[in-house]
Amino acid sequence: MAAIHLFDVVARHNQWLSVRQSAIASNIANANTPGYKSLDVQPFEKVLESTRLAMNATNAGHITDGATKAAAVDIRKSEPWETTHSGNSVSLEQELINAGDVNRAYRLNTGIAKAFHRMLLASAKA
């Protein structure tokens, strides 16, 4: 059974949420820019899959598998709900929904981390 590094996953998910929030903010800021295409990030599941088998090299002479580098979050063009005559594909409604999803996911993420932190403290006291 493989160890689950919950706090590492929480930190990686928070980083992914931060990048996604930046992409959403950029989309909202460019809502009236002609020809601007809305952006989004790859799903978090793909980020986890790309770094699943990462090994730690404790010495510079160790051979690594190439997966030890942190996977960069891929920012790509999102599927637009609508495109204006100027070619802009930002939908403010869609971006606000995405921002709400990021907020909800961040609160859930921090709630899980707090619960596990409390469990660790309780087990250390016992």
Where are these regions (language model features)?
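Amphipathic alpha-helical polymerization modules
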Residues: 1-126
